[in-house]
Amino acid sequence: MRLCDTDIERHLDEGKIVIEPRPGVERISGVSVDVLLGNEFRVFRDHTAPYIDLSGPNSEMADAIDRVMSDEIHIPDGEAFYLHPGQLALAVTYESVTLPADIVGWLDGRSSLARLGLMVHVTAHRIDPGWSGRIVLEFYNGGKLPLALRPKMKIGALNFEMLSGPAARPYNKRENAKYKSQQGAVASRINQD
């Protein structure tokens, strides 16, 4: 069952869902909570690796990812990160989100931004039960013009669903959880699969 706005507010009040800093009621509507863009970004360096073999040895994948990913870029409040057409970048939500073992979250992009070519998550939009941390955004500009992205702009919306029961293996209890408690724009850790 998807949670409505009053259920979301109740879960926030009870501490079952934690969003820090807590959004005001003006950012909770219908079935979702608007989330804001954080200050941390990562981009791909051009021409630093000929390819990444996604089924190759883990050490080779890790080395290739380290070569192609930039260090984290911090954009101060009020300044902009420019995402150019055809560019993929990682960013992070301003808020940190914590979910219990019986709720799954879903991140949706904003239609107004998509109409300008901005994809907020290339594929990964599920927020696992037991998740705690900031949410990494996989931006892609499919439009014709560069897009200026500013920290604390509305970037997406989270909605939540109750599971039929608590997950037996929530994210925070899994030993192999690659992105547990992430706070920045963490690069791919596919080599840890």
Curated annotation (Swiss-Prot):
Pfam families per record: DCD (PF22769)
Keyword Hydrolase assigned: yes
Record-level GO BP terms: dUMP biosynthetic process; dUTP biosynthetic process; nucleobase-containing small molecule interconversion
Catalytic residues in the record: 138
UniProt binding sites for dCTP: 110-115, 128, 136-138, 171, 178, 182
CDD domains documented for this protein: trimeric_dUTPase
UniProt KW Hydrolase keyword: yes
Pathway stated in the Swiss-Prot or TrEMBL entry: Pyrimidine metabolism; dUMP biosynthesis; dUMP from dCTP (dUTP route): step 1/2
Entry keyword set: Hydrolase, Nucleotide metabolism, Nucleotide-binding
Function statement: Catalyzes the deamination of dCTP to dUTP.
Family the entry assigns: Belongs to the dCTP deaminase family.
Subunit structure as annotated in this protein's UniProt entry: Homotrimer.
PANTHER family reported in the protein's UniProt record: DCTP DEAMINASE
Protein name (database record): dCTP deaminase
Organism listed in the record: Aeromonas salmonicida (strain A449)
